[in-house]
Amino acid sequence: MQSLPCSIIIPTYNRKKFEKLIEYNILCQTYSNILEIVIADDGDDEMLQLNVPYSINYIKCDRMTIGQKRNLLASKCKGFYIAHMDTDDVYLPTYIEHSVSILENQKKDAVGTSDMVFIYPDGKTGSMRNPLLSMANEATLVYKKSFWDEKHFAESQSSEAIYFLKGRHWQTAHSDIKKVMICICHSTNTVDKNVWKTCPEVELPYYEKHKEILRAINLIS
């Protein structure tokens, strides 16, 4: 059975430094039917130049909250599925394939996780577990376009998915963070991640190629 088309949406603001990481996050995906990349950029630095074999819809927009940008991006998508990619995270090759498989096997409309694993500049790792899908990290979400059509993200600067998912938990499934992403902790994170640095270290999934890129842009030692 042929995979249904998936749009990847990327909100960005002054993230030129992360260009090669963003590019590899897209290129490494094992999902077989990526339709397009949709980018909303309200920054004032250079536009991202991504060498990927997919159509790119690059939207230069006025300054917006992250919730407004996610809604703008979703509104422009042509795919059956929408996959979020934030600019400063490692997305594992299995991310979209794993997420879509859960949607199809469990007959759900959205999937994500509130669990997180972290890598800090000094190489220390950390993790955070949260069983509440109402607090799912927006960066991990994959959902049917029709799910967004029914209800949009809150137009806020953070936690915009709480409203998006509220009252729809029965339509939402939980993904495995170690098949989805690794959060990179750095000085310009939207949310400070240092609070979790005291947590026990964890073994991270394999991400050697990503490591090379992170070292090249001085995000890890």
Which role does the model predict for each range below?
Residues 39-49, 86:
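A conserved acidic beta->alpha catalytic loop
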Residues 78-79, 136-150:
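Conserved nucleotide-sugar donor-binding
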Residues 61-77:
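Glycine-rich, basic loop-to-helix element that forms the pyrophosphate-binding segment
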Residues 14-29:
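Short, well-formed alpha-helical segments that are part of the catalytic scaffolds
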Residues 152-221:
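C-terminal catalytic/acceptor-binding lobe
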